Structure formats: C-alpha cells, structure tokens
Amino acid sequence: MSSNSGDVRLWGGRFADGPAEALAKLSASVHFDWRLAPYDIAGSRAHARVLHKANLLTDDELDRMLAGLDRLEADVADGTFVGTIADEDVHTALERGLLERLGPDLGGKLRAGRSRNDQVATLFRMYLRDHARVIGGLLADLQDALIGLAEAHPDVAMPGRTHLQHAQPVLFAHHVLAHVQALSRDAERLRQWDERTAVSPYGSGALAGSSLGLDPESVAKDLGFEHGSVANSIDGTASRDFVAEFAFITAMIGVNLSRIAEEVIIWNTKEFSFVTLHDAFSTGSSIMPQKKNPDIAELARGKSGRLIGNLTGLMATLKALPLAYNRDLQEDKEPVFDSCDQLEVLLPAFTGMMATLTVHRERMEELAPAGFSLATDIAEWLVKQGVPFRVAHEVAGECVKVAEGEGIELDGLTDEQFAKISSHLTPEVRGVLNVPGALASRDGRGGTAPSAVAVQLAEVRTDVAAQHAWATAKQKN
C-alpha cells in the first residue's frame, strides 16, 4: 500500500474491498480525537523503545524511528501535518504521517505489539490527567478570588437563609467560605481521581496482551504513570470508569458553580441589592439601555446542565457493554472533551466576575436581623437560663407571633411584652437581640463568629496553596 494513496487503514487485509462511503463517514473520529495526537506520539516513542528492548528494532532503526516521530510531532504542532476524514482516526493519521517520513519498511514496524484499543485507553488517560490539573489550577484561582472577597469583608453581616427564607445572621465571609469548601472537595476529587488513573493500559494489545516480549511497565514509566501498568489487560482496554468519574467531577464542579451563580444573580437584583457586578463582567440589552445583565452567572447555570448531560450521556453509552473493547467506546471522548472545554473557558470568566464584585455592606447589614432571624438566639438564651429547649422554642415562637402582629422586629418588643409572653423573658434577653452578639456567640469550630471564620480562612489558604502546587506539577510525558 502506498503511503501517498491516502489509505493507510490499520485493518483490511481480509476484506476484498474498502468500506462504503457511508460507513467511512460514520466511523470517522479524527475530527474530534485529533487533540490526542501529542499523546499518541509520546506513546509511540515509548513503544519504539520497548520494541528495541525486545530486539524488534535495531539501534539504528530506533534512532531513525525517534527522529521521525520528532519530525512528525513538530509538523503536527505547527499545522503542517493534519489528520483527514480519510484517515478514520488519530492513530491512522499519525501512522500515515510516520510512513510518509520514514517509509513503509521502517515506519510499518511500529505497529507490532500494540492495538488501537490499548493505545486509545492510554492516551485518553494522559489527556484527562493533564486537563485535570488545568481545571484544578483554575479552581484554585477561583478559590483565591473567593478568599479575597472574604478577607476584604471580614466583619460584614448578612442574612443567612434556609429555604431562601431568613434564618440566622451570618458573616458574609462565612457564607463565601462555604463555597470555597465545596470547591475544595471538587479539587480533592480531581487529585484522588488522578491517583487512581495513574495506571497505564499500554501493552494490553487488543485485549489479551502481547506475545512479543514487550515490557508494559517500561512504557508506563516512560509515559509518567506512577503506578505502573494495569493488572488485567482486558480491564485495561475495556474499562472507562475513569472517564465516567472524570465526567462526574466536572459535572459536580458545574453544579457548585451554579449555586454560586444563582446567588450572584439574586443578590444583583434591585430587590436584594447585595452586590454590583463590574462592567467588564456584565452585558447589556439590545433594546433596554438601562440593563446590566449577569451573563457569566447565567451561562454558568446553563453550562452546569450541559456538564450534567455529558455525564448522563456517557453513562448511557457505557451501560451493559460486554467485555472487552466495543466500538461504542468511540462515543466516550466527545462528552468529556466538551466538559474540559466548557470549564476551561467558564472558570476564568467566573473568577473575574467574583474577584471584581462590589459588596454593599449597608444593605446586607440592614437585612441581617430582619425576618425575626434572632429568634433562635432568644431560645438559646432561655436554655442558658435553665429552660428546656422544647419550652424555649415555644416561647421564642410566641415572641415572633407577637412581633409579627405588631409589624415590628423582635428587638422592638417592650419589656412588658416580653414578660407577658413568659416570665423567663427578663430584660436581660435584650443582650442577645443584636447581630454582633449573635455572630460572636457561635464560636465553635465551623461557626460564624469572627474568631471561627478566621480559623476557616487560615485552613483554606493552606488547602488552596496545596492545590496550586498539585496543578502546576509536571507530568513525565
């Protein structure tokens, strides 16, 4: 077969004719798996070295093979060489490129002892491991922005909510750090996923391994897989749980971003007026000149659905596949490629939005005690006086009922009204009917007291610094 014929299929010897045009179009994946080309070439280098160790390439052949791969890599990087639909997939395209540079006698030797099945399983892991670190770094950048927001407003009180109703006053910094904690778990999931994925399927062949005396452990080390090669060649080529887990992590990141986004959207309304978005991270309306829209937050909400869809679509594809490799697995890449692409464009914009947010302290603190949010403080004050909590809860509820009927907040009740509600409500109860006191009293670990929040800040700074270090660590590709 001529390397210039445009037909260097990696199969076909037992077929009398080539595939139908409709099949070729259906089968083609080079338009989306071309992004794996650098990893394919790295794998080919490692494979050439084990072929040499097995005496299947001479010293001279290895040198020329590696030089040819270097030239091919450079041509791929600058766009001189690209895959085409006729190539079917990235592996076939790169074999064509190698044959064009080395000729069929030497270039054709690289196929020995490997299959596209173990190739793609390995390259896919390499690609996702690299992008896990990219996403991890972007997450850390967002966490830095949120930590900066908390540090800039350490003593601002706001209404804490459950069911979107006023619940108890909390520090704004405490609220923001709750989101940092959620993102820290996302980052931890990425690190743990990477640890599990650091095993190479290379050497598994189509499913049964190789009879050529090749060394999968050597390839694994060469490609930066810290835990060596897979223990079972069938599992190595057929499993895609690492893809599904990655898709879940990206979907969870999307969900966590959507929760922040929803709050920003609500807080930015005229009715709330808690925050104002920077002009550079807002958009306008084509007809209403007054509009300043939270598009980044809204797109984050929308893209979270897209990320969830990528996960669910992938899981449906993987369902009930028999061992080992099946062509269904061609469909495993686009969902997570898209998830990487979406997060890598969304996270920088989202970080910019949060880093430039203007917080309106007066409005937040105006509403912090509203909605009878200090009722729990009355109940807990009563408990400290020896009143059973069941009774204290009823008494505090009666205080709310009276205040609501009068159209006032709890601190507007008179001493006489308190005494009428319960003899336990002495004038000293007023000592807890203020937001600073309510905040300061919740000083246990994880609480909203300034002292507790300061501890949380110190802990997340350390955690995020470690995340940055992991994200910037280089793989040994």
UniProtKB/Swiss-Prot annotation:
Location (main, coarse): cytoplasm
Compartments (UniProt record): Cytoplasm
Class in the EC hierarchy, top level: lyase
Keywords: Amino-acid biosynthesis, Arginine biosynthesis, Cytoplasm, Lyase
Short name of any one Pfam family annotated for the protein: Lyase_1
Molecular function as annotated in GO: argininosuccinate lyase activity
Catalytic activity as recorded in UniProt: 2-(N(omega)-L-arginino)succinate = fumarate + L-arginine
Keyword Transmembrane helix: no
Gene Ontology terms: cellular component: cytosol
EC number(s) on file: 4.3.2.1
Pathway: Amino-acid biosynthesis; L-arginine biosynthesis; L-arginine from L-ornithine and carbamoyl phosphate: step 3/3
GO biological process: arginine biosynthetic process via ornithine; L-arginine biosynthetic process
NCBIfam families in alphabetical order: argH
Family to which the UniProt record says this protein belongs: Belongs to the lyase 1 family. Argininosuccinate lyase subfamily.
Protein's name in the database: Argininosuccinate lyase
Native source organism of the sequence: Streptomyces avermitilis (strain ATCC 31267 / DSM 46492 / JCM 5070 / NBRC 14893 / NCIMB 12804 / NRRL 8165 / MA-4680)
